[in-house]
Amino acid sequence: MKISEKWQKEWENKRVFDATPDPNKKKFFTTIAFPYPNSPFHLGHGRTYVTGDIYARYMRMRGYNVLFPMAFHYTGTPIIAMADDVAKGDKELIDIFKSIYEIPDDVISKLVDPLFMANYFKEEIKQAMKEIGLSIDWRREFTTIDPEFSSFIIWQFRKLQEKGFIVRDTHPVGWCPVHHIPVGMHDTKGDMEPEIGEFVLIYFDSDMGILPVATLRPETVFGAIAVWVNPHESYSIVEIDGKKYVMSEKASSKLSFQIDNLKVITVVKGSELVKHSAVNPITGKEVPIIGANFVDPLTGTGVVMSVPAHAPFDYFYLKKTKSELSIISVIRVEGMGETLAKDLVEKSNPQNDNDLKKLTEQVYRIEYNKGVMIDITKLVKPEYVEELKPLVNLPVPAARQKITEFITQKGLGRKIYEIMNRPVYCRCGNEVVVKILKDQWFLDYGNQEWKDLARKSIESIRFIPPEIKKDFEFVVDWLQKRACARTRGLGTPLPWDKKWIIESLSDSTIYMAFYTIAHRLKEHKLKPSQLTYEFWEYIMLGNGNPDEISKISGIPVEVIKAMRDEFLYWYPLDVRHSGKDLVPNHLSFFIFNHAAIFPHQLWPKGIAVNGFVLYDGKKMSKSLRNIVPLRKAIRMYSPDVIRIALTTNADIGSDVNFSDSYAKSIIDTLKNYYDLLEKLKEFKGEDEGFPEKWLKSKFYQMVINVTQYMDSLDLRSSSNEILYNFSSYINEYFELVRSEGREPNGKLLSQILQIWIKLLSPFAPHFAEELWHKIGKNTLVSLESWPIIDQSNVDLFIDLTHTYHRKLLNDIQAILSVYKDTPKSIKIFVANKEFLNVLRDAINIVQKGGQLRQLMEIHKPKGKQDARLYQKIYEEAREIDDDMKKLVTNFDFDEKDLLDKGLKYLSYKLGIKEIRILDASEMDRTKYNKDALPLRPAIIIE
């Protein structure tokens, strides 16, 4: 920690990462999602921020003028909800604050004040960011409740309103039933986005009232042969518009937020309902009401139709209850028949509800994608035959749409909304429901014009990893209206309706633009009242007259123009870093809002999305008590070890697994490099032989590889080269020079290690600074240039030559492992050079899909011995590895010369002094029944 603290102070004192426009340098503007300061950072937070910082440091070394700013997100309910929990004495939360985050009691008592909490955790998070080594320009820091930022958000929302992208409407939203506010991802525990989906209710008449069965598959109603209810749950008989309906008591409470005038008349037990029957409104058939424990009273209405031909649960439980009910098929799947659910249940023999859930997903997926409707006209009421005849032979998706329209238009049912990923809990602890919100302000992400702009933007964005692009395209397709304001929480009031506060996922979409001039607002001590709509209109879009704006605002015109210039220097944003959980909300809104407000040349250029962090293979959670505070982890292992551990043992889009053993292995690796630098002065050798040529080639090829990996943000491959492959190259170099009985070349090692420290710097900046100064440098390696790509130092022939030596070594060691006597000497018989040409031709023939006869036609064997050898060479060409293929196809060489270069190495590694290289023609065929093939010499041990 002493090393890291030393260099952090050095960076801060020298303002190393403050970014100022420089017309002579290419700019690189990167941001990471600003955090909610409602608790300290833990290891899971660290990955996204360190990933972004590694890339920022790399681009800085590549010669870019890098801007990497940071701010804090106070908006919305997360902070208020957390403060409320503290005020209520939430034992679990307070215990976590005490035992995991080690927050003093006297501080916890003050966390009941939302602003105290936000400011306290802001400083805690900021310190963690500094301790982990983030190269941030802190001059640009702000919070989202700063009045200056609020003026910017007011401008943004007026622009969106002008363009018709903000509407007042009625729409389903996630809703907290206690605080009576819309709920989005950042308002929920675990940051779960409430996913709202549609159920279709179909009205089955009964003498108890209408049973509104809830289904996602209305096209199967023709095959409904029963109605399920849960006999152990309470059911409400409710009145809606003068009619009686029966639904679970829990559903009636939930649906009261969607259905006006829903009035509970009485409550009965589900067991009372099973004494009755109901009538299918489409077929007119009377069906029994059956009790089933698997019916969830909180899903839909707690009333479900039973379609055993197409629902594994239904078939399984009907069979279990020995109900003698016929199965009615309505969907056919080519090659799989008309009773898919029944067939799969009987075939797979499910043991529990989890097995049934998997089968259900399988049946639904297959029938949706491949199913067509059979002739259902013989099943329906006579008066519906003509209207429903067009469903016959329709694919399931089209049939679902048509039957839904038929049901709703005929008054035979209606739609309701459900939280599809329930249970989702508001931060206050209550389960989120769906509410049909009236007269609410929405961002109209369903607007087709806006969707088209977003799609156009997506086409110009570089996505890392590339496959994440399709997820954004999917979001644009399904995204609809989203409530953009709340009546509770911190933030900016809606400018035209100030009882509403703009919510957290709506004021965090273009704030990256605010960074570009945030420090100038402070520098010139501008008042919020000066930051008018016209001011932002000019700074962000260049609209208006700066002289007029200066007169009205009192801001000097040169200051206004300078801020406009600085904005244009940094914008557009080059890359946005975030976790994959923000793809369906924040990151997509980020694309939409930029596309709506800015011209296309200022749209985002890149988005990098990373996976999560596991701890010992498990998700970090309160229940598992495996949350590790980031600052504590830094103290335990050091910042650079944490940086490497969080970013290098998985591809960027996959989850990283952090473990104590992995962190300690990184410590050992870094210590080995430190020890190597300590020993550098002991190496007095000056030879420039084969070992030195090989090491230079491997190292400079590594520089090329690392640069390519870093360009694509492949941190795993980069770090593998820098930390592990390089270590193996150094160790192998030492083996090579030992085999020659001499000292390593200290000068070469110093040159190489100097470059290697630069490669390491983005990943382990504190350790790299320490090593940099240890080798006598007095600059900051963080500000050094990235190594120049120099192909001239890469010698593929030297590299492949040693690969050949190692391959031969492995072959000899394999023979020695089964050799019973003590080996005294080795004879290596090398194939005649002419056979190398045969192998080259064989490789060419194999690559083109040719046959052995073509090789025979080219080289025309002189006898059976040649023909047999050619056949073996052809087989070798089919199996040869890539390295040996490169060697034989790219270079003209004598295999004996190749071996001569590795003779000392082989002797040293095998511990056998007498190794002779001979021509295959010198082999005594009567004594040794072996063939020497090109690159596969015959090995005789004596």
Curated annotation (Swiss-Prot):
Annotated Gene3D superfamilies: Class I aminoacyl-tRNA synthetases (RS), HUPs, Isoleucyl-tRNA Synthetase, Domain 1, leucyl-tRNA synthetase, Valyl/Leucyl/Isoleucyl-tRNA synthetase, editing domain
MF terms in GO: aminoacyl-tRNA deacylase activity; ATP binding; leucine-tRNA ligase activity
Motif position, 'HIGH' region: 35-45
Keywords of the record: Aminoacyl-tRNA synthetase, ATP-binding, Cytoplasm, Ligase, Nucleotide-binding, Protein biosynthesis
Main localization of the protein described in the UniProt heading: cytoplasm
Motif 'KMSKS' region per record, residues: 619-623
Family matches, as CDD domains: Anticodon_Ia_Leu_AEc, LeuRS_core
Subcellular location: Cytoplasm
InterPro entries: aa-tRNA-synth_Ia, Leu-tRNA-lgase_arc, Leu-tRNA-synth_Ia_arc/euk, M/V/L/I-tRNA-synth_anticd-bd, Rossmann-like_a/b/a_fold, tRNAsynth_Ia_anticodon-bd, Val/Leu/Ile-tRNA-synth_edit
Catalytic activity, EC: 6.1.1.4
Keyword Ligase: yes
Pfam families reported for this sequence: Anticodon_1 (PF08264), tRNA-synt_1 (PF00133)
Reaction(s) catalysed (UniProt annotation): tRNA(Leu) + L-leucine + ATP = L-leucyl-tRNA(Leu) + AMP + diphosphate
GO biological process: leucyl-tRNA aminoacylation
UniProt-annotated binding residues for ATP: K622
GO CC entries: cytoplasm
Family: Belongs to the class-I aminoacyl-tRNA synthetase family.
Listed NCBIfam families: leuS_arch, PRK12300.1
Protein name (database record): Leucine--tRNA ligase 2
Annotated organism of origin: Sulfolobus acidocaldarius (strain ATCC 33909 / DSM 639 / JCM 8929 / NBRC 15157 / NCIMB 11770)
